[in-house]
């Protein structure tokens, strides 16, 4: 590659051209000024980035030594806590101080609801997520197991199933927006009279809403509106009325659908759900982000023999009760997740020819792209408060948060953005951040817009941090351990006392089974009940259904109750290490190995061979689960731990990998791009899976990215060589990195 030199940086041509020809257009930023600013950031902050990574390694070595020394003595939580304090792992908790974050959008500070995470490498999925602000409740109930399917249901539209859906939707309306008299199922017609909702029942009586303030607006003629807009707990409900519609003509009041606010916010992901290993991949990520920031992104595709084009939805316009115009945001508020401090990219090399910290590049380009939105260039405005929300993952403690804040300040200065334009979302997914969360938040007190728990990454770090303490319990038992409950409560407790409500989100993790919506409806209500203002969902449909929970729970009221009750989580529980003192029967050990190996292979083979960073992967029981690098981290670290402590042998794990490869091959038999791993077991993907376990203990903090990146680059080079040998044009990856939802 003939790199382009700019201010001491050596830049991949594809990235250089993107900045000059696309990213800087209509921003007022000259490409040369951008590279000069980035060069200064790399020069000044690059060494600090590397030093903080060295601190991680030094602390891990000290902890490993402590566990080796105390291996044959009963675990002493007091001695352990004192040790963590002595080495600087556990820092003094600062006095409580309210955050000062300003200029946040209502989706961050006021509205509680679901949050999507979508890979930025796939334009169509990113557009679907951005447009998932509003979702059809009828479709979500009809098309999933939220309502159990009966034997003999008709193909296409089944009237009996449709009746159940409509009954469920009307029961929801009765719960969220009850009438003063009667039920929504009894309504013969909706109209607007003197700025109030007038409801005619089938018996001829007239009523209204029990709480008249829940009427927010309408579309069409006041006497025969085409839509009625209601609101509950800050979330809007759009009752679509069309008596000529195939659904509406069969039911009272002509209700054709109930559209509800669903994905209030969406994280555009540059990190765990993408496989971006080189400059070409990074430019794909950045180009899609640009299209979302300036409102021009489209995606054209074939479906059922038709050519369809997706674009960002417009805002929704209603007549307000007072006769004025009410405009509601038509799209999910977009946040961007950059990579962590531990990642480096060859898209740009420094003066020494070394890869630069990838997070520096992500922050600089994210800030540049946001100018298209902040300065009003965008056709579809994202932030109306003039902020950019950057989620920063995998930070270890307040010093690393401080580095991110300084980086954001430098980006603002180089781009001429208002101070504190760049907000920080703190992923509470590493153990040292958890135990020092109060200090982390205060370090970013003028920028923090989000804290979030992530069970899987957090468990991966739990295992790696205490690798020398002993064999860990079985993976499925982790959610019952004292540390995990303390972790979830600790995050909310600290978020409340630090004053996040009204200024920042308090988030919870992903529902990983996109086909099990009945289970999600039964279980994920726990997140708003826990005081979380948002929680992750795997699809737009899941967002629509999870939104129902925020109508059931008044999160702001629940937060006040929790805050009044005082802090619940204890540090001693948080530091309780999930080691096992059991001897498992051989069949349990085999089951654990097989489950882990199958999950690792099912995810890694798509990552390496096809560049798919997040997808629905069938587990060993053929249940589709959303997999990304977080799920891979826990599985690989768990097996590495059991190997290290002699619970399993190298031969047992390798035997399982080979048996599971056959199963994974069978599960992917319908994919024309899939490359089988059996019977040779010598593919790059199979080797990568083995590396993740057999080299797992030596990976910094148990991260999987370094091995995946190394092996994906190898696979891409092999594919390029094969195309060159056959005389084919080099078209890159056979498939965009995509979430199969």
From Swiss-Prot:
Task: Please indicate which superkingdom the organism of origin belongs to.
Answer: Bacteria
- Carries keyword Metal-binding? yes
Q: Give the residues the record marks as binding glyoxylate.
A: 337, 429, 454-457
Give the annotated active site: 337 (proton acceptor), 628 (proton donor)
Q: Mind listing the UniProt keywords for this protein, alphabetically?
A: Cytoplasm, Glyoxylate bypass, Magnesium, Metal-binding, Oxidation, Transferase, Tricarboxylic acid cycle
What is the required cofactor set for this protein?
Mg(2+)
* Residues bound to acetyl-CoA: 117, 124-125, 273, 310, 538
Question: What InterPro entries does the annotation carry?
Answer: Malate_synth_C_sf, Malate_synth_sf, Malate_synthase_TIM, Malate_synthG, MS_C, MS_N, MS_N_TIM-barrel_dom, MSG_insertion
Record flagged with keyword DNA-binding: no
* Record's subcellular location: Cytoplasm
Q: What does the entry give for GO biological process?
A: glyoxylate catabolic process; glyoxylate cycle; tricarboxylic acid cycle
Q: In which pathway does it act?
A: Carbohydrate metabolism; glyoxylate cycle; (S)-malate from isocitrate: step 2/2
Give an example GO cellular component term for this record: cytosol
| Subunit text | Monomer.
Its biological purpose is as follows: Involved in the glycolate utilization. Catalyzes the condensation and subsequent hydrolysis of acetyl-coenzyme A (acetyl-CoA) and glyoxylate to form malate and CoA.
Give the record's family classification: Belongs to the malate synthase family. GlcB subfamily.
Name under which the protein is recorded: Malate synthase G
């Amino acid at each position: 590659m003939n790199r382009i030199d700019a201010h001491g940086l050596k830049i991949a041509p594809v990235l250089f051209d993107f900045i000059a020809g696309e990213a800087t257009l209509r921003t007022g930023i000259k490409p040369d000024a951008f590279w000069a600013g980035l060069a200064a950031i790399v020069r000044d902050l690059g060494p600090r980035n590397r030093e903080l990574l060295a601190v991680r390694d030094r602390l891990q070595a000290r902890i490993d030594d402590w566990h080796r020394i105390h291996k044959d003595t009963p675990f002493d939580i007091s001695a352990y806590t004192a040790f963590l304090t002595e080495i600087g792992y556990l820092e003094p908790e600062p006095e409580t101080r309210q955050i000062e974050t300003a200029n946040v959008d209502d989706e961050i500070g006021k509205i509680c609801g679901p949050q999507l995470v979508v890979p930025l490498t796939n334009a169509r999925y990113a557009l679907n997520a951005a447009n998932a602000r509003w979702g059809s409740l009828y479709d979500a109930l009809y098309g999933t197991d939220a309502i159990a399917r009966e034997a003999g249901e008709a193909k296409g539209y089944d009237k009996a199933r449709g009746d159940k859906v409509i009954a469920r939707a009307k029961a929801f309306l009765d719960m969220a927006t009850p009438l003063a008299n009667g039920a929504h199922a009894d309504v013969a017609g909706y109209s607007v009279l003197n700025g109030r909702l007038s409801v005619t029942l089938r018996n001829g009586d007239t009523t209204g809403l029990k709480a008249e303030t829940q009427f927010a607006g309408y579309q069409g003629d006041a006497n025969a509106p085409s839509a009625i807009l209601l609101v509950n707990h800050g979330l809007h409900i759009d009752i679509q009325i069309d008596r000529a519609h195939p659904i509406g003509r069969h039911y009272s009041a002509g209700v054709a659908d109930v559209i509800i606010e669903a994905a209030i916010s969406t994280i555009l992901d540059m990190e765990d759900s993408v496989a971006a290993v080189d400059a070409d991949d990074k430019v794909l990520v950045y180009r899609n982000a640009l299209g979302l920031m300036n409102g021009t992104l489209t995606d054209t595709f074939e479906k059922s023999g038709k050519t369809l084009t997706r674009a960002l939805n417009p805002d929704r316009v209603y007549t307000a009760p007072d006769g004025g115009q009410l405009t509601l945001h038509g799209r999910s508020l977009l946040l961007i997740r950059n990579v962590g401090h531990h990642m480096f990219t060859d898209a740009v090399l420094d003066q020494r020819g070394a890869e630069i910290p990838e997070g520096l590049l992500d922050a600089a380009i994210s800030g540049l792209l946001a100018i298209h939105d902040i300065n009003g260039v965008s056709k579809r405005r994202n932030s109306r408060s003039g902020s950019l929300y950057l989620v920063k993952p995998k930070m270890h403690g307040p010093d690393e948060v401080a580095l991110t804040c300084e980086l954001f300040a430098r980006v603002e200065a180089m781009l001429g953005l208002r101070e504190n334009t760049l907000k920080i979302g703190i992923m509470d997914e590493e153990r040292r951040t958890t135990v020092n969360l109060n200090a982390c938040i205060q370090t970013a007190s003028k920028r923090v817009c989000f804290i979030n728990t992530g069970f899987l990454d957090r468990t991966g770090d739990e295992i790696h941090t205490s690798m020398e303490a002993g064999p860990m319990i079985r993976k499925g038992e982790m959610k019952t351990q004292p540390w995990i409950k303390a972790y979830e409560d600790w995050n909310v407790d600290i978020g409340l006392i630090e004053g996040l409500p009204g200024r920042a989100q308090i988030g919870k993790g992903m529902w990983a089974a996109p086909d099990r919506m009945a289970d999600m409806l039964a279980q994920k209500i726990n997140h708003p009940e826990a005081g979380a203002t948002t929680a992750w969902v795997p699809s737009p449909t899941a967002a629509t259904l999870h939104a129902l929970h925020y109508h059931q729970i008044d999160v702001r009221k629940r937060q006040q109750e929790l805050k009044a009750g005082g802090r619940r989580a204890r540090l001693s529980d948080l530091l309780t290490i999930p080691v096992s003192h059991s001897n498992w029967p051989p069949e349990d050990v085999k089951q654990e190995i097989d489950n882990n190996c199958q999950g690792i292979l099912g995810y890694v083979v798509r990552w390496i061979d096809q560049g798919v960073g997040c997808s629905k992967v069938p587990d060993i029981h053929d249940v589709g689960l959303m997999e990304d690098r977080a799920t891979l981290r826990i599985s690989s670290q768990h097996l590495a731990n059991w190997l290290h402590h002699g619970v399993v042998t190298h031969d047992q794990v390798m035997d399982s990998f080979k048996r599971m490869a056959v199963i994974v091959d069978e599960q992917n038999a319908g994919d024309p791009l899939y490359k089988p791993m059996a019977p040779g077991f010598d593919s790059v993907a199979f080797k990568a899976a083995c590396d993740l376990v057999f080299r797992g203990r030596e990976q910094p903090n148990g991260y999987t990215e370094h091995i995946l990146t190394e092996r994906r680059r190898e696979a891409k080079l092999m594919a390029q060589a094969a195309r060159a040998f056959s005389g084919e044009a080099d078209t890159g990856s056979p498939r965009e990195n995509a979430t199969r939802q």
